Amino acid sequence: MQIYKVGGAVRDRLLGKPVTDIDWVVVGATTEEMLAKGFRPVGADFPVFLHPKSGEEYALARTERKSGRGYGGFTFHASPEVTLEEDLIRRDLTINAMAEDDQQNLTDPYHGQRDLEERILRHVSPAFAEDPLRVLRVARFAARYAELGFKVAPETLELMRQLSESGELEALTAERSWKEISRALMEDQPQVFIQVLRDCGALKVLMPEVDALFGVPQPEAHHPEIDSGLHTLSVLEQSALHKQPLTVRWACLLHDLGKGLTPEEEWPRHIAHEHKGLKLIKAVNERFKAPKDCQELALLVGQYHTHGHRALELKASTLLELLQSFDVYRRPQRFEEFIVACEMDARGRKGLEQRSYPQADYLRGAANVARGVAVQPLLEKGFKGPELGEALKRERLKALKVYKESAAS
């Protein structure tokens, strides 16, 4: 029995990055031998075990053969005769196909260390094209290591392009796709993930609504970058630079989908793009079964981001309606995330990344004013039921009018 550290742990150590999760591969062992040593079996499809003390994953060396469509369409074979090299060749990228023994002696049959040094994301073998999930994984690695200068090898991008055209991407489950998308969006440069998907034709398959934004112009006076797709990438980039949560990043990606529906004769204006985009945002949300908080914020930002930009001009009554749409009294954090998404939208414009966004503090102040209206005096006056709600609304409107006047003076 020989045990090797494999995959990401080896890659990240060689890159000088912190190693968090460690995976191990066991060569020359049987399931019975692993159980006898106290390992706990957890793999449903192939022999994977948890170490009795560390809880880390140990997998028996295995080979795999394509047997059906999609991510799960594989037949696995694990036995003591499977070599380390045979196990490593089934992995996606050369930088993930290295192994180390307990003395840190490197086994690198597919030149992963060379590709690390040359900053290349390269597939290990033609079998790469058998697993459509790898398109998303490579794009995610491109986002993760963009700051180090990593690029996807042209021949790997070509395989990703073939996969995108094959129909295999449609076989991915919503859950697997969302897992990769959400992880990619939380990388330091998530816009690279979207760009790589576009470069290989996968964006057109997975998120045609986002792909449709590229080449659609906007008024240069407001958007010096002009292209709606490039603007979306910039907004997403800003959300990462400002360390925003997944909810905000997802909303930033989807906020302008309605612009892809504007007839060419109306370009570069996009009248009512907020409302038009809602059905597209809903479709993308449902396609990937995004978490409820991500779905809700994306729809609200899509519908109201122009309100956010025009906050200083809004009538007090419109401002109150905006606050109520977000249920700001019970869910203040959601409104805060909306404000931040609007600010990222404003900053995601060429040359305007550092421009101040006074609308943010104005909206926060308005929310505080509305929340500050006390209910008790109205109860003491005898208001109850629907009448209490209307009275509370009137008092909040009065308070917002005063707030608006004081902010203008």
Curated annotation (Swiss-Prot):
Enzyme nomenclature, EC number: 2.7.7.72, 3.1.3.-, 3.1.4.-
Residues where CTP binds: 8, 11, 91, 137, 140
Cofactor details (free text): Magnesium is required for nucleotidyltransferase activity. Nickel for phosphatase activity.
Residue numbers binding Mg(2+): 21, 23
Gene Ontology MF annotations: ATP binding; CCA tRNA nucleotidyltransferase activity; cyclic-nucleotide phosphodiesterase activity; magnesium ion binding; phosphatase activity; tRNA binding
Cofactor: Mg(2+); Ni(2+)
InterPro entries: CCA_bact, HD/PDEase_dom, HD_domain, NT_sf, PolA_pol_head_dom, PolyA_RNA-bd, tRNA_CCA-adding_enzyme
Protein's GO biological process: RNA repair; tRNA 3'-terminal CCA addition
Catalytic activity: a tRNA precursor + 2 CTP + ATP = a tRNA with a 3' CCA end + 3 diphosphate; a tRNA with a 3' CCA end + 2 CTP + ATP = a tRNA with a 3' CCACCA end + 3 diphosphate
Domain HD per the UniProt entry, residue ranges: 228-329
Sequence positions that bind ATP: 8, 11, 91, 137, 140
Protein family membership: Belongs to the tRNA nucleotidyltransferase/poly(A) polymerase family. Bacterial CCA-adding enzyme type 1 subfamily.
Assembly and interaction partners: Monomer. Can also form homodimers and oligomers.
Domain notes: Comprises two domains: an N-terminal domain containing the nucleotidyltransferase activity and a C-terminal HD domain associated with both phosphodiesterase and phosphatase activities.
Note: A single active site specifically recognizes both ATP and CTP and is responsible for their addition.
Function: Catalyzes the addition and repair of the essential 3'-terminal CCA sequence in tRNAs without using a nucleic acid template. Adds these three nucleotides in the order of C, C, and A to the tRNA nucleotide-73, using CTP and ATP as substrates and producing inorganic pyrophosphate. tRNA 3'-terminal CCA addition is required both for tRNA processing and repair. Also involved in tRNA surveillance by mediating tandem CCA addition to generate a CCACCA at the 3' terminus of unstable tRNAs. While stable tRNAs receive only 3'-terminal CCA, unstable tRNAs are marked with CCACCA and rapidly degraded.
Protein name: Multifunctional CCA protein
Organism whose genome encodes this protein: Pseudomonas fluorescens (strain Pf0-1)
Gene name for this UniProt entry: cca
